[in-house]
Design a protein with these regions (language model features):
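Short, glycine/polar-rich helix-capping loops at beta-to-alpha or helix-loop-helix junctions
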Residues: 65-70
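Glycine-centered small-residue hotspots that permit tight backbone geometry or close packing
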Residues: 63-64, 86
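Conserved SAM-binding loop
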Residues: 61-62, 80
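Non-catalytic interface/targeting segments
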Residues: 1-43, 47, 51-55, 75, ...
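Short acidic/polar active-site loop segments enriched in Thr and Asp
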Residues: 58
Length: 124
């Protein structure tokens, strides 16, 4: 599996839509085994989501992200982990620790949004 982080250099970008690059971490048996940095592409979000799905990305870590962008990932079964700052690798390690020990998710999606039936709401 892979985890994508929206970055500015080696740090989690403050704003998802202003990220300079995505860092993709390959994880095997809970251990980071590879890291690749890709420039942030100037293509529509659905194309990025399709690319991430083809690369087996299961989570996107970012700081701030607008709900429309987050929905693309959520609808593709890519977990969005928002409100994260600091060094990208540290964020991935913390995500893995929380996931592997069964702690609460940093961000989860509620499928029962009363305002918009059938849509997902991010709860931090």
């Amino acid at each position: 599996m892979r985890i994508a982080v929206a970055c500015s250099g080696l740090d989690v970008a403050y704003r998802f839509d202003h990220a300079e690059n995505f860092t993709l971490y390959t994880v095997t048996n809970g251990i980071i085994v590879e890291c690749q940095s890709l420039p942030y592409p100037s293509v529509p979000q659905p194309a990025i989501v399709d690319f991430f799905k083809s690369m087996d990305v299961v989570a996107l870590i970012c700081n701030t992200i607008n709900i429309e962008d987050a929905r693309y990932y959520c609808n593709a079964d890519i977990e969005v982990v928002a409100a994260v700052s600091g060094i990208a690798r540290t964020a991935v390690e913390q995500y893995l620790t929380k996931t592997l020990i069964g702690a609460d998710e940093m961000c989860h999606w509620d499928d029962d949004d009363d305002d918009f039936p059938g849509e997902h709401t991010c709860h931090l």
